Amino acid sequence: MSKKARVSVNPDFKIGSISKRLYGAFMEPIGSIVYGNMYNPKHPTADEQGFRKDWIEALKKTDVPSVRLPGGNFVSGWDWKDSIGPKEQRKEHLDLAWHQYIPNDVGHDEYLQWAEKTGIEPMYTINLGTGDINDAIYNVEYTNHEGGTYWSELRKKYGHEKPYGVKVWYLGNEMDGPWQVASWEKDPKAYGVLANETSKAMKWVDGSIETAVCVSSSPDLMHYPDWDLQVLKECYNAVDYISMHHYQSAEIGNYAQFMAASRYFEDYIRTEIGLCDYVQQLMRSPKVMKLSLDEYGVFPQPKGEIHFGREVYLEPGTHYTFDPRRGYVRHDPDNMPDRSFPPMNPMLMSLGNAAVILEMLRHADRIKIGCMTSGLGVAAACDHDHCFTIPAYYPYADLMKYGHGVSLRTSVECEKYDLPSFALDDTHKYHEQDQVDYIDTAAAYDQETGELTVFVINRDWEDTADFTLDVTGLTGFRFEGHSEMYVDDSVNEEDYAHVAPAPAAGTVCSGMSVKAELKPVSWNVFRFVKA
């Protein structure tokens, strides 16, 4: 059975320019991400700094534009000054966030020099938990100042003559989270004042930089969105972005929950835009705040216990547990655990994050930075021995390759479904989503190259879509083709590595209309070029 669907696109209906940083990634030294994937001095491909050249070369072949580093919860207890200079003089610390030892073999300079080697722009998160304004000032001076001062000359002494030129700086990480070291959960006004003063001082060191202030690190927290409002009232005119994070969970194998996940991001984005615009008017400010969704993901999760009636206690209580049996882990870069994937259709994992990017494209006028938490691993998956491609790479690669220029509005006519509210455990409870479109889409028009691309997800997990793409108004273009990616029922779990896009059969373009059959749970890319 198939369901009829129609999408209309007109190049005159523009949303806003698409920032290349929309397709960025995130890095934090958790597990083997840094000490294993990035750094392993014993690896056969290791360079003189201990970086794995196989991973660097794999990432260079992708279009990943930017990465937020070095964290993450980790930075709220990390002193960057302990990580510079000769390695034998660096201080090893406990990482309270992830209960691991941080040897600082990969330090401030290594993070930035690794980014230079990969050709990926670094976006830096400072410590505003245990750190202070002077730490931030010295960091920008060390990183970006030409020379002639203590910190800039120290950078030269340690081997980097020229400034790194980092342009985007994050004013702490998830500073509202009760799990954060030195959290500002209880005092958003004080964090807003600190962010204001820190941003001001950092920009006095380097007037070319931009800063991002933390808002609520999840729309599921009980203090959201009032915490955000209190922060923004104190620092609106001193910062350039708000830093947003959200992880949406879905029960393993539940197609309806996975395919509707991006709707929760839509609610979050719309609320934050409204909040920023309210504060703009409150401040009588000409500044239109930009958004940075710099940690996001859609992940499978098994159902756990739910303790009804304990919400107010359990939210902070979950993060205030003190287990004397829990020790600290030391990660050996040369002893990485095998990479494992959940036993489920890989298209769910692939489309979950791709749908979030489509949501960001539909708000491209305001969202200028995106950092997929698993982005580096999606772009270039690796284990101890080699790098390889996983199915989630392909939608991400299509978006990075073709999602440039201007985002266009798409009009969607299709059948819909309702998602009931659901709970997976005490901290993962989600309201219902009514009237979820089976068809999810976004479009990008690159006027410089003369290319128009329409990205389409068929969310339907049972039926194909009898699909029509109406591009009336697109004169002087020719239809370049339709690629599709899906998992056939005959494909077993061991064959998932072979899931990849291919030209779709049976797609026909007549005049300004394209007709196609969209497979269930599929990724589709329609391309037009100037004739």
Task: Describe the predicted segments one by one.
Residues 245-261, 306:
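Active-site His/acidic residue clusters
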Residues 1-225, 233-241, 265-266, 270-294, ...:
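Non-catalytic accessory regions flanking glycosidase/transglycosidase catalytic cores in CAZymes
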Residues 302-305, 310:
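Histidine/acidic-residue-rich catalytic or RNA/ligand-binding cores of hydrolases
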